[in-house]
């Protein structure tokens, strides 16, 4: 039974990640250089109103706030940054999971889910960071693509 639950969880994650391709901004077909998508694994739908912060590691080895946002009705945040501002570096995406679950009346285990990654070290890329949340676990994945794809 646990295997089937894990399998369904993985399939749900694949389904929502596969839909994170291009988005439409003001009628134009484009992609954001950094996009976040969050899914509530318990309810099987997008996680709405999740606070997300993006930090960039400084030369002094401290984390500096780079961008912030809140997931929309599709569990997504677009336009966190621009191609010009999103340079090479070490970034951390912080999902405020405790506030999300407490707003639903659930007491979760994790306060935050963090994803730390190096961006644009092999040339300019676009990144989709996807998170699948439950009160006692989380899973993340990333899609890294060339801006022209």
Swiss-Prot record:
Signal peptide coordinates: 1-20
Cystine residue pairs: none
Cellular-component GO terms for this entry: extracellular space
GO biological process: purine nucleobase metabolic process
Pfam families listed in its UniProt record: Transthyretin (PF00576)
Annotated positions of the 4-carboxyglutamate modification: 64
Keywords: Gamma-carboxyglutamic acid, Hormone, Secreted, Signal, Sulfation, Thyroid hormone, Transport
Residue sites binding L-thyroxine per the record: 37, 76, 139
PTMs per UniProt: Sulfonation of the reactive cysteine Cys-32 enhances the stability of the native conformation of TTR, avoiding misassembly of the protein leading to amyloid formation.
Sulfocysteine PTM sites in chain numbering: 32
Family matches, as PANTHER family: TRANSTHYRETIN, URICASE AND TRANSTHYRETIN-RELATED
Function (record text): Thyroid hormone-binding protein. Probably transports thyroxine from the bloodstream to the brain.
Family per similarity comment: Belongs to the transthyretin family.
Protein name: Transthyretin
Organism per entry: Notamacropus eugenii
